[in-house]
From Swiss-Prot:
Component of the general transcription and DNA repair factor IIH (TFIIH) core complex, which is involved in general and transcription-coupled nucleotide excision repair (NER) of damaged DNA and, when complexed to CAK, in RNA transcription by RNA polymerase II. In NER, TFIIH acts by opening DNA around the lesion to allow the excision of the damaged oligonucleotide and its replacement by a new DNA fragment. In transcription, TFIIH has an essential role in transcription initiation. Keywords: DNA damage, DNA repair, Nucleus, Repeat, Transcription, Transcription regulation. Belongs to the TFB1 family. The keyword Ribosomal protein does not apply. InterPro entries: BSD_dom (IPR005607), BSD_dom_sf (IPR035925), Tfb1/GTF2H1 (IPR027079), TFIIH_BTF_p62_N (IPR013876). Signal peptide: none annotated. Component of the 7-subunit TFIIH core complex composed of XPB, XPD, TFB1/GTF2H1, GTF2H2/P44, TFB4/GTF2H3, TFB2/GTF2H4 and TFB5/GTF2H5, which is active in NER. The core complex associates with the 3-subunit CDK-activating kinase (CAK) module composed of CYCH1/cyclin H1, CDKD and MAT1/At4g30820 to form the 10-subunit holoenzyme (holo-TFIIH) active in transcription. GO terms for biological process: DNA-templated transcription; nucleotide-excision repair. Its main location: nucleus. This is General transcription and DNA repair factor IIH subunit TFB1-3. It comes from Arabidopsis thaliana (Mouse-ear cress). GO terms for cellular component: transcription factor TFIIH core complex. It is found in: Nucleus. Residues 107-161, 186-238 form the BSD domain.
Length: 579
């Protein structure tokens, strides 16, 4: 369980914002500020008592935990339901500790986890929602023990994974402006499918949108209304009708936030320009501008992307979007937050940007040193030797002038002057020698049997042809994208669950102990339950999607069938051996 709280060491303490993570054996508080050293870890069996404010007492929802050492830990929650949920969770954990007191004193070697390893396991479960689902499904249901579950993930718990986890996660190369909605031809409505990855990318590329979300949601509008206005502004951008955009911006001040230039990005650009070499002549690049020529320029949605000076406040260019998108992709994921709460993601990203901004600011001494170093490297024209250029510097406005001037030079060169001479006889000899070797020794046996490869090829051909008929000609669209979100998540979860079960099943053979026999029996029952869930899922989907879902489910059922067949044959062999 995880809740957003404010930790207080005493009553009048202003508090530290962070997240409270609860398990049956430990309570962990992690502050939002990554530079803060305030981290709290409390063993559940060390909690002596808990006090809380009553609902309706005009006091904030506080939960005061007192340890057996006499220390008080006060947590202020956002609302009373969160506080009551945590209080009930701690009460159940304390009751379990009282029922099994021996387990608190005498621990098996597998249960004697160090604090660092426990924190790492907790961190992995918190950051990986799919891993958390598997842990809840198999460990809490007693199909696997805690030790068995983590035994197949030693790389995640090793030192190498700790070092690799510091690497920043990348972002997809797809631009935010390239998100296309689905259109309903009957109601003339467009629907955008927003995922947590897309929301994070929007917040990273557009700081003004991120700040507007923090300011407006939920004080002035709901999250749905916010994204509706955002995509309305994006639609106005795509139409290139600046007059309509200006009119709607004048009537709706919230919509105007998305249409105005991003002041946060402009401020960041001004700060970056202070670090640019002042001797750099950026006007020299103007001669490379070919966008005004025929057959040149950048096309966007079928028309040239040109900004008119009088309307540049209400229109972005494709170059601006590309440059910003490239900068965000190169920067990577600067925060490590996996949460369904959009506000948590926005606030965490804002804090990370503020920290990086503070780290990147140039101090006065560093700026002075940079200027002095550049002044020493700057050349003075009157002290340099005269440079007599044989030709005048080129400033080509039209590339055709260059290519037409080079055509005469090419025709004047003797034919074949630069052509490399190939030894035809040598190549023929090598080819003839290779053919003789094949005739003498013959070809080796194929790695894959022809009938197997033909069956796979035929299956792929049927699948691809069926998918093309259903999905159309859009290569970026997959069948999973057409499924309802609940069905898509269910298919993915079943696939990861089956992988987990099958991995533990096959690693338990050969069965040499009673422990392995019991473990295989539990896994077999869990796989049977999953098999029935797959059949139920196939029957529950729409009729037009049932065939494609069956194709997705078929490899899962084949993997389970192979495990069942091996289980039955091995059980018969062991039974016959005993009798």
């Amino acid at each position: 369980m995880e809740k957003r709280v404010k930790y207080k060491s005493f009553v009048k303490d202003p508090g530290t914002l962070g997240s409270l993570e609860l398990s049956e054996v430990m309570l962990l508080f992690v502050p939002n500020d990554p530079k803060s050293d305030l981290k709290l870890k409390v063993q559940t069996h060390n909690i002596k008592s808990q006090k809380y404010t009553k609902e309706g007492s005009n006091k904030p929802p506080w939960l005061n935990l007192t340890s057996k050492q006499g220390r008080s830990h006060i947590f202020e929650f956002e609302n009373y339901p969160d506080m009551h949920a945590c209080r009930d969770f701690i009460t159940k954990a304390l009751a379990k500790c009282e029922e099994e007191p021996n387990k608190l004193v005498v621990l098996t070697p597998a249960e004697q986890l160090s604090m660092a390893e426990f924190e790492l396991r907790f961190k992995l479960l918190r950051e990986n929602s799919e891993l958390q689902k598997l842990h809840k499904q198999f460990v809490e249901s007693k199909v696997l023990t805690e030790d068995e579950f983590w035994s197949t993930r030693k790389k995640l718990l090793g030192k190498d994974s700790i070092r690799k986890s510091k690497q920043q996660m990348g972002l997809k190369s797809m631009m935010v402006s390239g998100i296309k909605p689905s259109t309903d031809g009957r109601t003339n409505r467009v629907t955008f499918n927003l995922t947590s990855e897309i929301i994070f990318q929007i917040f990273a590329e557009k700081p003004a949108v991120r700040q507007a979300f923090i300011n407006y949601v939920p004080k002035k509008m709901t999250e749905k209304d916010f994204w509706t206005k955002y995509f309305r502004a994006e639609y106005l951008y795509s139409t290139k009708n600046t007059a309509v955009a200006a009119a709607e911006a004048a009537e709706d001040e919230e919509l105007a936030v998305f249409l105005k230039p991003d002041e946060i990005l402009a401020q960041e650009a001004r700060q970056k320009m202070r670090r640019v070499d002042p001797t750099l002549d950026m006007d020299a690049d103007e001669g490379d501008d070919y966008t005004h020529l025929m057959d040149h320029g950048i096309q966007r949605d079928g028309t040239n992307d040109i900004i008119e000076p009088q309307n540049d406040q209400l229109k972005r260019s494709l170059l601006q979007d590309l440059n910003r998108h490239a900068a965000v992709v190169l920067e990577g994921r600067c925060i490590n937050v996996q949460s369904e709460d959009t506000r948590i993601v926005a606030e965490a990203l804002t804090r990370a940007k503020q920290v990086s901004k503070a780290d990147g600011e140039i101090t006065k001494d560093a700026n002075q040193e940079r200027l002095e170093r550049m002044s020493r490297a700057t050349e003075m024209e009157d002290l340099q030797a005269p440079q007599n250029f044989p030709l005048a510097p080129l400033s080509i406005k039209d590339p055709r002038d260059y290519f037409e001037s080079q055509q005469g030079n090419i025709l004047s060169e003797p034919r074949g002057a630069k052509a490399s001479k190939r030894n035809v006889h040598e190549a023929y000899g090598l080819l003839k020698e290779s053919i003789l070797v094949i005739r003498m020794t013959g070809l080796s046996d194929p790695l894959i049997k022809p009938e197997v490869s033909f069956e796979v090829f035929s299956s792929l051909t049927r699948t691809i042809s069926t998918a093309k008929n259903i999905l159309g000609k859009n290569p970026q669209e997959s069948f999973l994208d057409r499924l309802p979100k609940s069905t898509k998540d269910e298919v993915i979860h079943h696939w990861t669950s089956i992988q987990e079960l099958v991995r533990h099943f096959w690693s338990s053979y050969p069965i040499t102990t009673t422990y392995l026999s019991t473990k295989v029996g539990k896994l077999k029952d869990a796989m049977s339950n999953t098999y029935s869930l797959l059949d139920a899922m196939k029957q529950s989907v729409q009729s037009d999607l049932r065939h494609q879902v069956s194709l997705l489910v078929r490899p899962m059922q084949q993997a389970l069938d192979a495990a069942f067949q091996h289980y039955e044959s091995d059980l018969q062999r062991r039974t016959a051996k005993i009798t």
